[in-house]
């Protein structure tokens, strides 16, 4: 039978690995993904997202005010021209109706290629980064017992 100190050491290693793995995964996600907000204490108000470059409530790049559009100058009214008398046009002979052309059959659309999976962001929590501490801790517990 193993001494009690080995059991305590195994539990300690399990806890340390577990908390380290969860901490690394949370740090990789960043504060904006956790829904942390600044302000918005009143009822019905929404705060602003906390970013890495928080400027303590000041807007570093205020939007420029749009310049007023200049008013267009009034155009002088043209003088009306006298209307010429219309000449009688000869009646055109009716043309025979052309036969309607058969519509070409629409070509079937090619199937779209499946989109490739997006590459993970650098530093993002992956299955490997989260599962590895659990595996190490479980192996330590099994080895202790």
Curated annotation (Swiss-Prot):
One of its GO terms (cellular component) is plasma membrane. A lipid is attached at residue 123 (GPI-anchor amidated glycine). Residues 124-145 form a propeptide. Residues 28-127 are annotated as: Disordered. Residues 1-27 form the signal peptide. It is found in: Cell membrane. Residues 59-122 are annotated as: 32 X 2 AA tandem repeats of [DE]-P. PANTHER family: OS05G0225800 PROTEIN, TOL-PAL SYSTEM PROTEIN TOLA. This is Procyclic form-specific polypeptide B-alpha. The gene is PARPB.
